[in-house]
């Protein structure tokens, strides 16, 4: 009886169970409607904002990152969110991760730009073209902000390098 139950359970889903992962759809097939632009823009700004934990982007540590690390602010209280930045005392759980966060935002912006380029070939209505233009402008602005943030943190001053080095990787495509 046990063997019959196990064989019934093991074979009962084979006809209707989708075995392909839901995230296996290529980007240009998944982002194929102008109606998806608004949720994509919301996701882009949510990625820029982050959450309130200490490894977040604009919701937490980036706002004070330069000031605290440059001694403009003294964060000497041990319970403060900025004390690990001030003391430069990092571990796996509290690393500010200021390299990966902007690149995550840049990747999201590049995906939105790719979707806009793919949709631009398909849309014919002026209203849809205006939505595409708006989404494209927002993605370009957020991507530029993330690149600027990387330059503020990692690039050397222009006077030291005469503009010969960028200080970070410039990502304009996926």
Identify the residue ranges that each predicted region occupies.
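Hydrophobic-face positions in mid-chain alpha helices that act as interaction patches
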Residues: 36-39, 69, 174
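Secretory-pathway/luminal and periplasmic proteins that interact with or process carbohydrate-rich
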Residues: 49-55, 146-157
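Acidic helix-start/capping segments at beta-turn-to-alpha-helix junctions
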Residues: 62-71, 129-135
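Short, flexible helix-coil linker/hinge segments at the edges of structured domains or between repeats
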Residues: 159-174
